């Protein structure tokens, strides 16, 4: 609905992926938790082989072996958390609806894909998973878990944490290769914020 979009999403944010592409509307969530407060709650990792391609092109620190420990660390995977490629103690719950909870349309689409020869995978986040699956979702007990819920809420009582409303991060600030802060736009003007560590 339009009211939802105006209140919780940036309706004038333009972006492009290449220099030649024309800028297009880029829907992103606004509010504490950003897009995780409004997205589809899918907990789907990037394909590990793609990270290895990035590393082969020079993206140091982005190989599958570099990123996998971070994927594992953030997860609390209710189904596969006890397996080597998943985590069970992170702040982000990962849930997959059992087939018994699927509706008739979902089941019909699943069967059509299987009949067309697409393989079934229990875990779309496994390295070799390609085909039909139950989407992994970041929800717990039927409730969305945003980055606000997972990271900020548990830290709200810390004396070194200040959450500013009506603040828009314009860009991340760097010293060499290290991110040191952010440039933000506040109602009173622009302001830079720097990390202590």
Predicted regions and their residues:
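Intrinsic-disorder/low-complexity regions
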Residues: 10-11, 159, 191
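Core beta-strand elements of the Rossmann-like FAD/NAD(P) dinucleotide-binding domain
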Residues: 188-197
């Amino acid at each position: 609905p339009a009211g939802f979009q105006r209140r919780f999403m940036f309706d004038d944010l333009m972006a492009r992926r290449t220099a030649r592409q024309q800028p297009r509307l880029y829907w992103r969530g606004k509010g504490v938790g950003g897009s995780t407060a409004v997205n589809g709650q899918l907990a789907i990792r990037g394909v590990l082989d793609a990270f290895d391609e990035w590393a082969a092109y020079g993206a140091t620190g982005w190989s599958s072996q570099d990123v996998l420990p971070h994927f594992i660390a953030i997860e609390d995977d209710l189904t596969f958390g006890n397996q080597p490629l998943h985590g069970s103690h992170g702040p982000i719950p990962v849930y997959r609806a059992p087939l018994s909870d699927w509706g008739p349309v979902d089941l019909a689409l699943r069967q059509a894909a299987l009949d067309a020869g697409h393989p079934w995978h229990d875990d779309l986040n496994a390295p070799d998973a390609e085909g039909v699956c139950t989407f992994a979702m970041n929800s717990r007990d039927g409730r969305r878990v945003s980055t606000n819920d997972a990271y900020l809420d548990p830290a709200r009582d810390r004396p070194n944490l200040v959450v500013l409303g009506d603040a828009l991060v314009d860009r991340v600030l760097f010293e060499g290769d290290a991110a040191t802060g952010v440039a933000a736009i506040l109602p009173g003007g622009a302001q830079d914020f720097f990390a202590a560590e």
